[in-house]
Amino acid sequence: MKKTIIGVVIVAIVCWLGGSWVLAKQQPSQEKITIVGSTALQPLAEAVANDYRTKHPQTSIIVQGGGSGTGLSQVQAGAVNIGSADIFADQQDGINANKLDDNIVAVSGIVPIVNEELGIKNLTMKQLQQIFTGQITNWQEVGGPDLPITVINRAHGSGTRVAFEQTVLKPGMQAVNAQEQDSNGTVKEIIRNTPGAISYIAFAYLNDQVQSVSLDGVAPTADNITTNKWPLW
């Protein structure tokens, strides 16, 4: 069962825009499978689960979020069959990577987003860094309206946050104190309803409810992610 599911996932990523499935070793075959972890990978997990169910209707597959840290800790504890994460097992404190199998299945782009009424469509990487470290606190400083910047960060344990900070922040820099949320969907909803707000989400969650932000003139598109023109992934 384990090999079959992972095979389906690997085929699926040809059409998807890194993340990984992490499996506890020596899992027995079974008719019920639980996948928990990264909300960035949740749309992929749900799509694969739906496809698998059509071919194997006797199998129950439960897909839940919770964040990369939760996925790793739950699969290590044997509470779930598959943990999804957009960090490797050896990057998470408290996880014994030697007891888990890492399986790379996708590259997930990360997109800065703002409230669509703000009027900001492009930032430099330096400006993004200064916003998330609290050096820039008003949108007027980057060509926007005279409006305080409200930073919404991802929670500790989020693989998306780890990837974002590794790319945007320099060593030794600390993110500004801010409200933290543990799911892409919640972040998007807050940005949609909060003038002056900025955060970041996985590419799979991007839609016209929020304004995506280009970086140094490069737009967050599937083509730019796959050709490595887009810096956040």
Where are these regions (language model features)?
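Exported/periplasmic ABC-transporter solute-binding proteins
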Residues: 2-233
